[in-house]
Amino acid sequence: MKKQHDTIIVLDFGSQYNQLIARRIREFGVYSELHPHTITAEEIKAMNPKGIIFSGGPNSVYGEGALHCDEKIFELGLPIFGICYGMQLMTQHFGGKVERANHREYGKAVLKVENESKLYANLPEEQVVWMSHGDLVTGLPEGFVVDATSESCPIAGMSNEAKNLYGVQFHPEVRHSEHGNDLIKNFVFGVCGCSEGWNMENFIEVELEKIRETVGDKKVLCALSGGVDSSVVAVLIHKAIGDQLTCIFVDHGLLRKGEAEGVMKTFSEGFHMNVIKVDAKDRFMDKLKGVEDPEQKRKIIGNEFIYVFDDEASKLQGMDFLAQGTLYTDIVESGTATAQTIKSHHNVGGLPEDMQFKLIEPLNTLFKDEVRVLGSELGIPDEIVWRQPFPGPGLGIRVLGEITEEKLEIVRESDAILREEIIKAGLDREIWQYFTALPGMRSVGVMGDERTYDYTVGIRAVTSIDGMTADWARIPWDVLEKISVRIVNEVKHVNRIVYDVTSKPPATIEWE
């Protein structure tokens, strides 16, 4: 029997941070779902949530193409918390004034609490918050009071406690807001009255039921790569429908060292799944020959991947569904109906229009760290659960520019050395993701008294909670030295190593 739990609904107005809001709430043990701003009041009412959060967004509430919501949502009597654009939308709805700011405010600011509403209960009077806005609330709606101010924002927070309506001009969901979690927690528990009750055990129960209802007696193909996401998808679906699942492992020649052999051993022998291995290396390399543009590479790899599945499915009987390990972060990085696109993601951007399968994506409401917890709950070994995140296009987007066998081998061997040394140093759980990339640039060097003109290998290592934001990892110098010396000595055609010290934003984690 499905367990009941309190729910907070988040309405998406296009912020790149909107997924983080739901993520923060789940960290509190309360279920949260993201829905498009076009959802109706009746649909929300049917979900019986305890409260609603309006996300931020890049638009102006008074501008052309401004995003709005069903005005009846304000009549549901539910607590509403507007963040940035969400606060401005609330202001506009209730007759307040929103104007263009003299200067766009982006970055850290000091917030001063002027009125201790429930939102600011037990929080410091001054705190650092993260601002990202071009508009300001300059006139309060009737019945609202100013909760907080900042140097550049006279109305940085407002509330109408009689109606349980709250708004902030900053982003509490971003970790740069030092008490942001506590503020959201105050809304979820203090204002909405939620109770903890959602966890991975609940998620598994709900998803197993959903998979069985969706699939019925039909069959599912799973795109198994051996990475964390596809592994968890495969085990979850196998747990739900058993032998109705067939896993197809496509070796596209863009995998890490030893990965192909490891996948077959773990899933075919260890989990007793039906796994079909397809050697498609030549097919992929032919399609990628001469292609340098990263977006084109992603599309080609995504398309070819599905076509391989089509070919294999035609040999099987009655395959209706294709399972993918799409995550929340995959979707936000590819752009939703409202979010501005950062890059086409390998799981959601490269699908051909004539695809013959219906997609089943049981992880598309989870973040990477949640997927690891789910994997452990499902009994998947740590060496798989804590495996490095690996993109669908594989090493294809870690070789910048045209892909060749020589370049792939350089990345494959250097990446294996990096992983080996990071594990030896005991840093594999501290660093969220680490890999090598080949930027395609050559430089002059000296090896054995001879001049060389060889490739540079870039090392990328980041710390993160959920992949939405990331900081470059402070790997100890002695460990970096070992990695550098080994790669230059053991990998052919490499004479220089560089370390990427850029956070996300402004950079993405992958180089392409």
Curated annotation (Swiss-Prot):
Which PANTHER family has this protein been placed in? GMP SYNTHASE [GLUTAMINE-HYDROLYZING], GMP SYNTHASE-RELATED
Source domain of life is Bacteria
Q: Supply the name of the protein.
A: GMP synthase [glutamine-hydrolyzing]
EC annotation from Swiss-Prot or TrEMBL: 6.3.5.2
Q: Which residues form a coiled coil?
A: none
Every copy of the GMPS ATP-PPase domain together lies at 198-387
A Gene Ontology cellular component where this protein is annotated is:
cytosol
Q: Which reaction does it catalyse?
A: XMP + L-glutamine + ATP + H2O = GMP + L-glutamate + AMP + diphosphate + 2 H(+)
InterPro entries named in the record: Class_I_gatase-like, GATASE, GMP_synth_C, GMP_synth_GATase, GMP_synthase, GMPS_ATP_PPase_dom, NAD/GMP_synthase, Rossmann-like_a/b/a_fold
Q: Which residues form the Glutamine amidotransferase type-1 domain?
A: 7-197
**Gene, per the UniProt record:** guaA
Q: Which HAMAP family match?
A: GMP_synthase
Q: Which residues form the active site?
A: 84 (nucleophile), 171, 173
